[in-house]
């Protein structure tokens, strides 16, 4: 017998939609208003900078001839499927894990869309200190990192007792 979807972690899928709208919206604005390589200072140590990433995090495998596009697309799809199954198997009340999974799925789908549509991921956030620049990233990357951090945080939190779970 199947359980009602709103009693599962899938209740948190609305957050995937929010992440996608914000991520794809920010990338659309960059594509419409910036030429490749353009930079606009926002705050000290923070720029908007249009960059294309043909690889993964930190441009890993960016110069590998194109096969990596499909490799990373497959990884994103696989991770999304696994996390959706985990959300279905978890209770809607397990907020921290489900929020984390939804953030990761939203970020993965945002970057997957870029890979499939453009052949690269649109990056635009340039954080720097002095002459040192962190790798340029986007809001999907941020959602994935926040989701991963929440999973780690959940591992350090005390587990609820049987009474608290009932």
Curated annotation (Swiss-Prot):
One function term, GO molecular function aspect: aspartic-type endopeptidase activity
GO cellular component term of the entry, any: plasma membrane
GO biological process, any: proteolysis
Superkingdom as given in the UniProt entry: Bacteria
Alphabetical keyword list: Aspartyl protease, Cell inner membrane, Cell membrane, Hydrolase, Membrane, Protease, Transmembrane, Transmembrane helix
Broad class of the protein's primary localization: membrane
PANTHER family in the cross-refs: LIPOPROTEIN SIGNAL PEPTIDASE
HAMAP family linked: LspA
Role played: This protein specifically catalyzes the removal of signal peptides from prolipoproteins.
Similarity annotation: Belongs to the peptidase A8 family.
Name of this protein: Lipoprotein signal peptidase
Organism: Salmonella typhimurium (strain LT2 / SGSC1412 / ATCC 700720)
């Amino acid at each position: 017998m199947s359980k009602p979807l709103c009693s599962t972690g899938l209740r948190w899928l609305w957050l995937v939609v929010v992440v996608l709208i914000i991520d794809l919206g920010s990338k659309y604005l960059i594509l419409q208003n910036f030429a490749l390589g353009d930079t606009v200072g926002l705050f000290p140590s923070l720029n908007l900078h249009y960059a294309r990433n043909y690889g993964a995090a930190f441009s890993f495998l960016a110069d590998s001839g194109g096969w990596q596009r499909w490799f990373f697309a497959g990884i994103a799809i696989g991770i999304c499927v696994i996390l959706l199954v985990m959300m279905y198997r978890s209770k809607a009340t397990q907020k921290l894990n489900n929020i984390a999974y939804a953030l990761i799925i939203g970020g993965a789908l945002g970057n997957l869309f870029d890979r499939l549509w453009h052949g690269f991921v649109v990056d635009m956030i340039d954080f720097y200190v002095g002459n040192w620049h962190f790798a340029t990233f986007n809001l999907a990357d941020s959602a994935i990192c926040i989701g991963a951090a929440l999973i780690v945080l959940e591992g350090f939190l005390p587990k609820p007792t049987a009474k608290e779970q009932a």
